[in-house]
Amino acid sequence: MAIPQLDPYQKAQETRRRVLELAVFMKREDGGNASSRPRGTAQPGQAVDMFLALLQDRLPVWLRILDDLMHLVGKGRVSDNLLPIARAGIDYYSEVQSAAVPVFTSPSVTVRFREALRDSELGPMAEVVPLTEYLAAEQRAGRIPPEVDPLASARLLLAGCLRHAYYEMFVGADFLPSRDDSAEEIVRELRLDLQRA
């Protein structure tokens, strides 16, 4: 959920604090147990640490980018405003997903992470809400067709970004459109701009 009435710096700090709480929860639940993996291979705890450190660094920036959309209501074309969001989303998911994969190979870590994510309110709605609010504000301003569902459109934009990052991680960037081209395609296919007669 969005953090009400905080300036952007405070919001970023609050997000970092929540990620740290998430990390503390994960460590407490882990109990500091060492794995019996062969020497030279990554320990499960190391993967969790790396993922949470990356999340602590990247998530506040990503949420701030989404929150800053509200400053663009009524300015420029809606699709032009969303294009850098889609590109930033692809970049964010590409970085975070690659660090997340080794973390979620353990079912128990996955369950603990889900619990911690719910408790910290850093789940998917943390990014869906600001994007939905922007689209709803543009719709109220008459710049998005009335039949558009802002929540569904926000989810579709984010899903398109996540999909590109996912495919890029598994098949490689050479087999996909560029990140810029994918961002353009994602935004274009939402068809949010009003068509002029």
Language model regions located:
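Amphipathic alpha-helical linker/stalk segments
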Residues: L55-I85
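Phosphate/oxyanion-binding loops and surfaces in catalytic or ligand/nucleic-acid-binding neighborhoods
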Residues: D57-V61, A88-Y92, V96, G160-Y167, ...
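Amphipathic alpha-helical segments that line or abut small-molecule/effector binding pockets
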Residues: R17, E21, L52, S79-P102, ...
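Hydrophobic/aromatic-rich alpha-helical bundle segments in the mid-to-C-terminal region
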Residues: M125, Q139-V187
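Short, structured helix-loop boundary elements
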Residues: Y9, R16-R17, R37, V48, ...
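Amphipathic alpha-helical segments enriched in hydrophobic/aromatic and basic residues
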Residues: L20, K27-D30, S36-R37, A47-W62
